[in-house]
A protein has these predicted regions:
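Basic, amphipathic N-terminal segments that precede the first structured/catalytic domain
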Residues: 2-63, 196-199
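Metallo-beta-lactamase
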Residues: 20-21, 101-118, 122, 152-208, ...
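Conserved beta-strand hairpin/beta-sheet module of binuclear metal-dependent hydrolase folds
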Residues: 31, 40-111, 220-247
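Core dinuclear metal-dependent hydrolase active-site scaffold
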Residues: 35, 66-71, 77, 184-233, ...
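Active-site metal-binding loops of divalent metal-dependent hydrolases
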Residues: 38-39, 81-83, 131, 155, ...
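Feature marks short, surface-exposed loop/turn motifs that line or immediately flank catalytic pockets
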Residues: 42, 85-87, 157, 251-253, ...
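Active-site metal-binding motif and surrounding structural segment of the metallo-beta-lactamase
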Residues: 93-150
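Cap/insert and terminal regions of metallo-dependent hydrolase folds
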Residues: 98-111, 221-304
Length: 304
């Protein structure tokens, strides 16, 4: 479909914003990804710990991260939202005990974006990788202000699974997701189960279905230039430079290095497939970085 030297350019014609795809060098403007640590939680990081005697002794403090992607064509993309400033008022008692959330003034996604000179109205898309409360808690700060709120897990949420009813706080997202932004997965050659969706339809931001942690969880691949990865991944290491927001498909590098399943998953076998897929992606010579929702990083920003 596109060659490796294809680039995206934004243009306005007769009042309509469009993306022009043309041959040339890679995007001259850099793509920037910022990690926004929006507080912490205290949980069991590995699935094996949950099944041991006295598992609470293994609980550790982990960051709760959201991510800002500043894209030269598609603008500002916020991936997940982290804790809200009033998280302890939002969570029911049993979830407060489960997560033990902590957040200090200035740590919310909204406040960190303000420090960068961005308002909620400046966010073009809010992407929710799944519907757990540590990812949706601060969605209210962007609802009605960000141009789009996109989530794919809704088709799984409306299922008989009781875990959805006790683990996810409906009021943090149900009022804010419009019907037209309920994205459905489609077939692709990329991912542990071969499903995903192309967010903008131009191969720049791919949401790859990685079930296991929840039934509808996805990771986000940001491509430097069109790669046609959804169609030709089976041909080998194809395309251009990319970065990955792994969300909760893996909590940290340890999951990838040792093929350890993260804690609190819906399906351990699918979790392991998703972890192995991420490990393979990270080996690619085109991979510029991989970031996790619950892992600290020496880098808070990446340009590529």
């Amino acid at each position: 479909m596109y060659g490796r030297n294809t680039i995206f350019r934004k243009a306005t014609i007769e009042g309509y914003n469009i993306v022009i795809v043309q041959e040339g060098d890679c995007i001259s403007e850099e793509i920037k990804i910022s990690i926004l640590q929006c507080g912490t939680m205290t949980v069991l990081p590995y699935e094996a710990d949950i099944r041991r005697n006295n598992p609470l002794e293994k609980r550790i403090v982990l960051p709760v991260n959201a991510f800002l992607v500043e894209h030269p064509v598609h603008g500002n993309i916020l991936i997940d939202t982290g804790w809200a400033s009033n998280v302890n008022d939002i969570l029911p008692k049993y979830l407060k005990h489960f997560y033990r959330p902590q957040i200090t003034p200035g740590q919310t996604a909204k406040e960190q974006l303000a420090a960068k000179g961005l308002r909620p109205e400046d966010i073009d898309v809010v992407l929710l990788t799944h519907l757990d409360i540590d990812h949706t808690c601060a969605l209210k700060d962007f609802a009605g202000k960000a141009k789009r709120i996109v989530c794919a897990e809704l088709e799984y949420f409306y299922s008989p699974r009781y875990v959805y009813k006790i683990r996810q706080v409906w009021d943090t997202w149900i009022p804010y997701i419009k019907t037209e932004d309920r994205i459905h997965y489609r077939s692709s050659t990329l991912g542990p189960v071969g499903r995903g969706f192309d967010l903008f339809g131009d191969d720049s931001v791919l949401c790859i279905y990685t079930p296991g942690h929840t039934d509808g969880n996805f990771i986000v691949m940001i491509n430097k230039s069109p790669s046609d990865r959804f169609k030709h991944h089976g041909d080998g290491d194809v395309g251009s430079s990319f970065a990955v927001i792994a969300g909760d498909a893996a909590f940290s590098e340890t999951n990838l290095n040792e093929h350890i399943v993260p804690g609190y998953g819906f399906n351990r076998k699918l979790q392991l497939k998703s972890v192995e897929f991420l490990a393979d992606l990270r080996k690619s010579s085109y991979c510029c970085g991989m970031f996790f929702s619950h892992s600290s990083s020496d880098r808070t920003e990446i340009f590529f």
